[in-house]
């Protein structure tokens, strides 16, 4: 690495991106500083703007610049269906299929006891309160009076994703909620954002 604290700092910052190792980070840093300084400044400005402007939707947790995201605010969406995903990237993958017109809840993660990630870290209580709201006396509304009639579990088909889906399903079924899971057309061990759109669409249609 060249004798530059600034260059080293940029390289270390780029390494924070998923899948970027030492060599890739150094290559990107050299390219930006040697060949594309205007592009580097554009990236810096865009990143700063996004960090300062983007927040979590108060209803579904996805990333948005508004208090409520465009999907949750859209009156044309089917509010009786709620699809639970791990990340905004998974939500985007489902949206691209054009096969789903309901609403979403983004966990922003998955259960992983080995990493110290438990139910409170991924907002499970917020999900349960969304699906099974309570009346003015603090009692759960009966199934027929709830807005959400079906919860579709679209967590990834990894060990952690399956465990997360199982915990959510058990909790919601005990509250009288209809819970379905994406069909097994999605390969085991895969993440939704990397699965082709046709496969995701079929998994949605064939959910059970």
Swiss-Prot record:
What the entry lists under SMART domains is as follows: TOPRIM
Q: Which superkingdom, per the lineage?
A: Bacteria
Q: Where is the Toprim domain?
A: 80-187
Keywords, sorted A to Z = DNA damage, DNA recombination, DNA repair, Metal-binding, Zinc, Zinc-finger
Zinc finger (C4-type) in chain:
57-72
What biological-process terms (Gene Ontology) are attached?
Answer: DNA recombination; DNA repair
The GO terms this record gives for MF are: DNA binding; zinc ion binding
Q: Which InterPro entries does this UniProt record tie to the protein?
A: DNA_Rcmb_RecR, Rcmb_RecR, Rcmb_RecR_Znf, TOPRIM_dom, TOPRIM_RecR
Q: Which Pfam families does the entry link to?
A: RecR_C (PF21175), RecR_HhH (PF21176), RecR_ZnF (PF02132), Toprim_4 (PF13662)
The record's listing under NCBIfam families reads: recR
What's its job? May play a role in DNA repair. It seems to be involved in an RecBC-independent recombinational process of DNA repair. It may act with RecF and RecO.
Give the family, as the similarity comment puts it. Answer: Belongs to the RecR family.
Name of the protein in its database record: Recombination protein RecR
> What organism is this sequence from?
Polaromonas sp. (strain JS666 / ATCC BAA-500)
Upper classification of the organism: Bacteria, Pseudomonadati, Pseudomonadota, Betaproteobacteria, Burkholderiales
């Amino acid at each position: 690495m060249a004798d530059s604290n600034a260059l080293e700092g940029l390289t270390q910052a780029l390494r924070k991106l998923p899948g970027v190792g030492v060599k890739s980070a150094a290559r990107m840093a050299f390219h930006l500083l040697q060949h594309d300084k205007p592009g580097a400044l554009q990236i810096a400005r865009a990143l700063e703007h996004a960090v300062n402007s983007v927040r979590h939707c108060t209803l579904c947790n996805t990333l948005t610049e508004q208090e409520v995201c465009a999907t949750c605010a859209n009156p044309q969406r089917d509010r009786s269906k709620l699809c639970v995903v791990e990340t905004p990237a998974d939500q985007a993958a489902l949206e691209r299929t054009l096969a789903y017109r309901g609403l979403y809840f983004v966990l922003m993660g998955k259960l992983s006891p080995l990493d110290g990630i438990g139910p409170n870290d991924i907002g499970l209580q917020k999900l349960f309160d969304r699906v099974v709201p309570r009346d003015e006396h603090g009692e759960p509304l009966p199934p027929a009076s709830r807005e959400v009639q079906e919860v579709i579990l679209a967590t990834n088909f990894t060990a952690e994703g399956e465990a997360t889906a199982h915990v959510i399903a058990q909790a919601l079924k005990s509250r009288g909620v209809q819970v379905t899971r994406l069909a097994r057309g999605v390969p085991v061990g895969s993440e939704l954002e990397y699965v082709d759109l046709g496969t995701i669409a079929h998994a949605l249609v064939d959910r059970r």
